[in-house]
Amino acid sequence: MNKLYLAWWNLENLFDIEKSQYRDTWLQEKLKDELKGWNAEVLKRKIGQLSKIIKQMNNEQGPDLLGVCEVESRHVLKQLAASLGNQYDIIHADTNDKRGIDVAFIYNSHKITPILEETQRGPQPKVYSHVVMKRNATRDILQAELIWEGHPFIVIANHWPSRSGGELKSEPYRMMAGETLAYWMDRIQDIRPDVPAIVMGDFNDEPSNRSLTEYALSTREHSKAASKRARNPYLYNLTTPLLGAEIGTHKYQGEWGFLDQMLANRAALNNNNIHYNKGSISIVANNELIKAKNRPLNQGQPRRFNRPSSKYYDPEGYSDHLPVSIELNLPK
């Protein structure tokens, strides 16, 4: 097959059980009220709900690579991967986020292979966990390289600081994350300019916000990102064709937005490399994922799973975000 299906999904607080042996003491104390009632049965239910949707992706073949955020640990991530089938494996690095949630990848090992390095656990995917300098620790930016049919490509997962405390007050933190991303994209451009890179994440900002356009150098102009004459390594925002659609990836105060996005570097827009299949960007949205109460889907909102300690706990739910997906093609 000359097609690769990539997706991104904010899993909404996929934590390990309430009193997990894998959780640090400081985090256990911090989360004890939030995770009250989050037992093995609830975790199994949450994983089952997520797994059901993930398996439906890519015409029920499942994604070839899925970027995720709001997953607590390697331990719980491996449980999710196992629920998808034995062909799936994970790419993960612990971060110092103040709520203990990370970004990661799940990939189909029958189709793509990560670059490996030797570790205490034996050969593991080689990752670069780029720290975002912030007073209160946030998620690192996770970078990995994979091989598909002999061709390398890079994937980078983001979960930028939230809008907690207000959009404007928190904006500098996301600008900092954008600057960090741009720095590493600049290094990739300098050292490996012909390697395609797909950047994905929950940026907690819209495509038009400064953190993306001015700091991460994301653009909605395909020609600007594809140009070899551009002085800076611009990223084409693949979400561009979806802007203005009736449904986004997240709903806040009755308005759909596009906090979850995918971006591509210049090499990923070149048909001589692994490249983005133009027009393939899509939001994964259906009657299961959106709670619309017999109204049109755009009038509903993502059906949250939440947690037992919340009055909004819904064991039939999934996440407060919708997944977004793209396709990549082999060189022509």
List PLM regions with ranges.
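Structured beta-strand-rich core segments of catalytic domains in phosphoester-bond hydrolases
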Residues: 65-152
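Metal-dependent phosphoester/phosphodiester hydrolase catalytic core
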Residues: 20-22, 28, 149-156, 160-179, ...
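Active-site beta-strand/loop signature of hydrolases that rely on acidic residues for catalysis
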Residues: 9-11, 38, 43-46, 50-77, ...
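Extracellular/periplasmic catalytic domains that process cell-envelope and extracellular macromolecules
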Residues: 1-2, 59-60, 84-85, 97-99, ...
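Extracytoplasmic/secreted cell-surface and envelope-processing proteins
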Residues: 75-76, 99, 164-167, 207-210, ...
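Metal-dependent phosphoester-hydrolase catalytic domains
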Residues: 188-195, 205-332
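N-terminal, active-site-proximal structural segment of metallo-dependent hydrolase catalytic domains
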Residues: 1-101, 291-302, 311-312, 329-332
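Beta-strand-turn-beta hairpins that frame and shape the catalytic cleft
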Residues: 1-6, 15-18, 110-113, 136-164, ...
